[in-house]
From Swiss-Prot:
EC number: 6.1.1.11
Native source organism of the sequence: Psychrobacter cryohalolentis (strain ATCC BAA-1226 / DSM 17306 / VKM B-2378 / K5)
Domain text: Consists of two distinct domains, a catalytic core and a N-terminal extension that is involved in tRNA binding.
Name under which the protein is recorded: Serine--tRNA ligase
Signal sequence range: none
Gene3D superfamilies in UniProt: Bira Bifunctional Protein, Domain 2, Serine-tRNA synthetase, tRNA binding domain
Protein's job: Catalyzes the attachment of serine to tRNA(Ser). Is also able to aminoacylate tRNA(Sec) with serine, to form the misacylated tRNA L-seryl-tRNA(Sec), which will be further converted into selenocysteinyl-tRNA(Sec).
Amino acid sequence: MIDPKLLRGDLTDLQQQLATRGYTLDIAFWQNIENERKSLQVKTEELQSRRNTGAKQVGVLKKSGEDASELLAEMQSVSGEIKTAEDELRTLQERISQAAMQIPNIPAADVPVGTSEDDNVEVRKWGTPREFDFEIKDHTHIGETLGMLDFEAATKLTGSRFNVLKGQLAQMHRALIQFMLNTHTIKYGYTETYVPYIVNSESLKGTGQLPKFEDDLFKLTNHTNNDDMDFYLIPTAEVPMTNLVRGERLDIKELPLKFTAHTPCFRSEAGSHGRDTRGLIRQHQFEKVEMVNIATAEQSDELLEAMTGQAEFILQQLNLPYRTVKLCTGDMGFAAQKTYDIEVWLPSQETYREISSCSNCGDFQARRMGTRVKDGKQTSLAHTLNGSGLAVGRTLLAVMENHQNADGSITIPEVLRPFMGGADIILL
């Protein structure tokens, strides 16, 4: 959530900043509701002052032996008015909070202004796309020919946008997870965590998925009476890992905190009808290794650069060409103030596709979660960062396509071989 103070002053600059994100700030609404809040605040304070003055007068009357019953009755009436005013103010504050929850984060100053992915800015490239001397096959064809990727079985078991992996492809999927976790924990000092795959609504509000993006989530229902439960399947491990510090006061000496986890992720893909219907690109259930950093305001910019580099290192070790782009204002996620996307080269599509997104959310999530940093007697809001390190299914398909051979086999990247019993190739 953005700083509420920004909604109480001149809203023109804020409106212009949010407009670059495709969000229209209703200035009239916020001015009217702020005037209403001020009026209620003044009314409440005046009534409280009247009650305090009356209480002193009652004391004086009683001390002098005079009758205070009339004044006591008046003060009782004032107390009732105060309760009514406080209830009205509390209700209004809740309305303000709910409305503020719908506002996206403010872009950082160095984020390029744009409306779509076409306006993203390439920062760097690594690796040269391989030149093939045979007809390139996509990962779906490769996996199905090997008999190790089965969409038909997944459709029978569940429905569309699911998959079944078998044999060495399933092993490589597991090997990728192990390699990623080892890299983040051993090389980069992350603390590995095992977190619930089901979270409550407060967790999703904390990281910004609720209330705005409920349609993208899978919500659980009580099968006995069809009542909604306050449980959702996680769309990313960012949600449980970031919420580990919800409501906490963190000692500045302990920061940054660096968490990593491997989890399945569950997304309804409500807004992607007809997109990437073939293959592993866009699934309702997929695996991801996630990175989360909890930091101070002074640390967060540098940590975003480091986190992005850590995700890039995984791709370098797998010898997968990629490019890194800085997202424009109109393409960033709701909670982010700055984001880098890493896009891996897919030979069958002759283009780069997103495989990681690394974001600095500033104090946006921390404000929603109530997470603060203690520095002596001073406290301030923490900064939160998250990044994919990496999306496992997309990494698997990138390995399959970039390391395919003419005979339909797949050369196993050297760093994965220790996790696959020393095998160096997946054969037909």
